[in-house]
Amino acid sequence: MNYEEIFQKYKVETLKGRYITLNDIEPVLKKWNTNNQLQEVGTSVLGAPIYSYEIGTGKNRIFLWSQMHGNEGTTTKALFDFLNILQSKTELSEALLDNFTFYCLPIVNPDGATLYTRENANQ
């Protein structure tokens, strides 16, 4: 398996740079929301939506999250690249989706992401 090739093929090109916010991820999530997999499960202190995205039908459940610390966007980019692989309808993605259900909170701390800080707005 050529990991460099996989990385290049499934990298979400719209997520780049150091700062990743809800404004960056919402268009991608909404594009992928073909079967009501995207849910708003809460709101931040400042009123920003906190999303959950579910994909797969397997009995093994995996919980994924990113940006608990708002200034750590690298994990969000990696998470979206992985979710993009799951969208690919390849033999690998179908095997993963048949065996696992992935529950994702793509940005746990949207306020911190907007302010580019580790803390949330709850002071």
Residue ranges with predicted function:
Residues M1-Q123:
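Structured catalytic-domain cores with a bias toward divalent-metal coordination
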